[in-house]
């Protein structure tokens, strides 16, 4: 039994919206709920806003700020660019659902391209920011130290790539119907 073209368009649109919701929830979990911490173990906490190392002298974590991070070899500009990339990706991803809904309701290719542009920029920013941050702090990290925040950002990046491919393969439907509001 063949699925009609209308249902196929609606199913692909719903799948795309579900993927967008998953990306937003994964990025919100990692960057807001986990406060950007990629490693949060008892003797080490490293994230976009936390850099705490275990001090044997005092027997607890000692957190460092920008002046001390420069002494440790982490440039202030590099850390700021990594933060901008990762948190900017979340901000751009938040703006994706509205153009998608408008493109679906109005059958407008321009709004669809705007959503694809937001997703593409979000994907590039997330990959660049996360890579830069890992490059800057890798001498204190091990692969086994990376926690759920890191895993959710990696999964969000993979879903962003899948989402971009899906949006290119399933563009908005043709302008055949006159009453657009009933199709939303």
UniProtKB/Swiss-Prot annotation:
Location(s) in or outside the cell: Membrane
Cytoplasmic side: 1-12, 105-117, 171-184
Protein name: Transmembrane protein 140
Matches recorded under InterPro entries: TM140
Stored Pfam families: TM140
Superkingdom of origin: Eukaryota
Membrane topology annotation: Multi-pass membrane protein
The keyword Hydrolase belongs to this UniProt entry's keyword annotation: no
Topological domain ranges for the Extracellular compartment: 34-83, 139-149
Assigned keywords, A-Z: Glycoprotein, Membrane, Transmembrane, Transmembrane helix
């Amino acid at each position: 039994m063949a699925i009609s073209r209308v249902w196929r368009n609606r199913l692909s649109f719903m799948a795309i919206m579900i993927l967008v919701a998953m990306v937003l929830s994964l990025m919100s979990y990692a960057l807001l709920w986990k406060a950007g911490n990629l490693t949060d173990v008892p003797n080490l906490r490293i994230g976009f806003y936390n850099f705490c190392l275990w001090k044997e002298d005092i027997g607890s974590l000692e957190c460092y700020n920008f002046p001390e991070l420069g002494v440790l070899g982490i440039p202030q500009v590099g850390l700021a660019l990594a933060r901008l990339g990762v948190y900017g990706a979340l901000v751009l991803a938040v703006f994706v659902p509205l153009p998608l809904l408008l493109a679906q309701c109005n059958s407008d290719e321009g709004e669809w391209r705007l959503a694809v542009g937001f997703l593409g920029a979000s994907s590039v920013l997330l990959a660049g920011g996360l890579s830069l941050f890992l490059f800057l702090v890798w001498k204190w990290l091990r692969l086994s130290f990376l926690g759920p925040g890191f895993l959710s950002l990696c999964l969000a990046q993979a879903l962003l790539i899948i989402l971009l491919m899906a949006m290119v393969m399933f563009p908005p439907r043709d302008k055949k119907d006159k009453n657009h509001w009933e199709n939303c």
